[in-house]
Amino acid sequence: FGQAGPRHGSAPDGGSTDFLPWMLPMELAMWNCVSCEMWSAYKMKQLGLISKCVPVINDKGKWVRNPAIITDKYIEDGEIVYGEFKIGEDAKKARDFVKSAKTDFELLDTEVNKILWTYTNLFPGCLIKSVEGIRMKKKFFWDQGKTVNRHWLAVNMNCEAYLGFNAFNTKKITGQDVIDFIEYRRRQAQGEAFDLEFMAAVLGKPQKS
């Protein structure tokens, strides 16, 4: 779970900005929305954003949870580590394991079937009214901001989004997927025109072949 957001020239309007404050504590909602960090499904389950995580790797008949995520302990040195990404050698071992691991969605299918069977045994009219009643809180803010958000997104495509999207799309050429944010802020603070020279100064340069 994560946002492309401000790191790549966008803002998750009509999505995360609407529902995250309802689904996470405010400070966590703010940080998840603006930091563009990736948070694991296990971390999101622990925080209450999702209701279930199931393993999809089957190793010789044994179900294995995501090996890149800490799931075998909750606390380390006084900090909650459950759901955090492994680092260093542990992360490398996890990536190597996943390359040859067998993917099996049996447990996921089972959980989906449980949800469907639960819904099947409910009055359909009451079910949809209940679902819409929960979603109404998000939709209220979506309706309040959808017009101004649309106009802002159109303008943004000619500025920060243009830079961010191009930086991301040319990663194979430049070796980097983001602009030079320090140079961008420096030129902006000096009041320089947003022109071709400005854009060339902050975008990555083609790597030498």
Question: Model regions: which residues?
Answer:
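A structural signal for hydrophobic residues in beta-strands of small regulatory alpha/beta folds
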Residues: 53-54
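CoA-thioester-processing core
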Residues: 1-33, 45-47, 60-77
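C-terminal alpha-helix plus adjacent terminal tail
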Residues: 36-43, 57-209
